[in-house]
Curated annotation (Swiss-Prot):
The lineage of its organism: Bacteria, Bacillati, Cyanobacteriota, Cyanophyceae, Synechococcales. Mn(2+) 2 binds at residues 256, 261, 280, 342. The active site is at residues 268, 344. One of its GO terms (molecular function) is manganese ion binding. The gene is pepA. Binds 2 manganese ions per subunit. It comes from Prochlorococcus marinus (strain MIT 9313). GO terms for biological process: proteolysis. This is Probable cytosol aminopeptidase. It is found in: Cytoplasm. It is an enzyme of class 3 (hydrolase). Presumably involved in the processing and regular turnover of intracellular proteins. Catalyzes the removal of unsubstituted N-terminal amino acids from various peptides.
Amino acid sequence: MEICLFPATLQSWTGDVLMVGMFEGKMEERLNELETLCKGSLMQSLEKQMFKGKSGEIATVQLLQNKPNLLVLVGLGEPQEMRLDDLRKAAALGAKASLGCSGTLGMMLPWEPLDAASAARAVAEAVRLSLYKDLRFRSAPEPRSTPTKLELIGLPDSAGKDLQAVHPTCAGVELARQLVAAPANSLTPAALAQTAIQLAHEHGLECSVLERSDCAEREMGAYLAVSQGSDLEPKFIHLTYRPQGPVQRRLALVGKGLTFDSGGYNLKVGAAQIDLMKFDMGGSAAVLGAARAIAELRPKGVEVHVIVAACENMVNGSAVHPGDLVRASNGTTIEINNTDAEGRLTLADALVYTCGLEPDAIVDLATLTGACVIALGEEIAGLWTGHDPLAEGLTAAAEAAGEGLWRMPLPSSYREGLKSNLADLKNTGPRPGGSITAALFLKEFVEASIPWAHIDIAGTVWSEKGRGLNPSGATGYGVRTLVNWICSQS
């Protein structure tokens, strides 16, 4: 889809579908302007549809003239409550109403209260991402028409300075959605590694994959313990973006890569949603999606390392037992008191490996705890870090992306819950504060001198019903936040 600005007036626009945002109680002037397009039928149509401009309301009017042939009005609510995310939601509604149109979609929104460039990028991303549909596994997908061009009406040319980032970023989100949505018999650890290799080949990145024997040589006992219950080989992925010219910052992204999580001998039952545990590699999807975007955007001065310890957590005669002791690659011994707390074990060795790269900052993303979902729900991810500048940078990046992120406490006193009578640590603490003790467990495997942040995306990785610009299913959460954060370091 081509994206461009249309600085001229609404009356001179001649596309196929016109979407206009309307404030509640402030519609009269705009409706009078639109009335000429509808040849007197607009007010009557809106009365029938009971459109008042409330947030989330939508009305459609078929026009008798050739261009445009469909008018879409989307309610924005009260003008004083206007935020960038309201534009995203309105644009997503308008885009979905344009399905069936293969021509030009025009959007007229109240740009002025907000930064024009930020608003243009937010709306363009919302349109592309809301039109996404995964048809890879359909035997006979139905034909589907979407707009081939998006014109943002009433914006000056200067507002287009960030539009070049839209398609690379959205392509990264769509890759993440595809990876998360793929069933576990399709997206195996080997398939995830192949995705990274293909990204490297197509986008000028570097990629290395460590096999089981390589990981054993590095004494990654925690990671390999999780993998030993599966017939599928683990794959430890290291993908690297190197900028042209001198490197000023070296950043590392670590993504949890459990392509399926049965829970192990602490088998997932009841409300544990074992049928959805294909999405337990959502962290790896986010960091690979971000790598895909960064490879095309090519920020200067920033080197980015993407690390994924991919495997399955399954049950067989070789699977790790509850109560087993393992040794991580930094020498820390761990008592596994719950085999369903496996993600932190794989991340432990991944974080130790990443520290060896001497990065200036590490950010890990993981579908780690149900406790985070209980605390923050399905629209906000949790952020744990002891480094204020890193927290501020990630929070600002998430806000600009429209992805919910909330900083959570990391009190050292909660580490008491991880003490073991046999080993240095247990892999789970008491049920209260479970997301905090999970973050504290990970902290044990990060060198104190390296700024580190942990983002728990257990609630945000998947949307059962769909919301805003996210379809039902995989959301691709985290890609846009990571891309914004990395580019801000350039």
